[in-house]
Amino acid sequence: MTTKKKQKLTGGHAVIIIVLVLLAIICFYPMWYTLIMSFSDKVYVDAGRTWLIPLGLNVKSYGKILKDSLFFSAMWVSVKRVIVGCAVSMFMLIITAYPLCVPEKKFPASKYIKWFFLANMMFSGGLIPFYSLMRQYNLFNNFWVLILPGALPLWNMILMMNFFRNVPYALNESATIDGANPIQILFKIYVPLSVPSIACLFLFQFVGHWNGYLDGLLYINDPAKQPLQTYIYNLSVTLDYSTMRSEDIIAMAQTSDKTLNAAKVIVAMLPILCVYPFIQKYFTTGMNLGAVKE
């Protein structure tokens, strides 16, 4: 029978634990502060007295959200953006990374394509030309302006390419000898063997689309077509009472713009908090597959 020796806590370990605990508190407290603010009474929030626990428990901010049709309209735009954007981006990532992962002697042009992508990552045409381009393509005030410009994120494409390189190329050659075409090889060999990596990049795309606000702010003027994060940004930066209905102004007097915005941030965070636990088990595995070389 073997017994494990207890390791003594050294000074170095204690320092590491303290630093990690402090980092955990720094990361967790902003979310906790937003949560308690959303449930606190406006008197305590405006006085700056809410720090650790909710004061004067109040759920009127969440009741106001349930009556805000524009909030749910913006959320529906974000949901559509996540579904369509992730589907388009993952498809583009897979079909672009696959031919670039093969050895250069099999596909000599891949070297030049990689340099072309790298140049696009390093140099940008600028915001104003890009804005004009969106207008010329009639994408201004169009849902697809949230999808098409970022349909192929180049950094994620490089990660996907490295993930595919971990699949032995001998499998590709064996499948070719057996009569499989490139599409069959991709979707029956590479994709199933790269599920953790694909799930990892899917999480990146999901968070990116859900948290995106700048494109909606720049290219969409119609509030009914803007995504949720743009809607919340507009509320947090500018609160225009001239465009609000009388019942909204009365509700704002009973709550607070701070508590209302905090409640909307909490509601907007829920989809990420719900999706992440299911993909977390793939996250570390997927990143290791692209980072470790033997």
Question: What does each model-identified segment do?
Answer:
Residues 2-294:
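A hydrophobic, multi-pass inner-membrane permease signature
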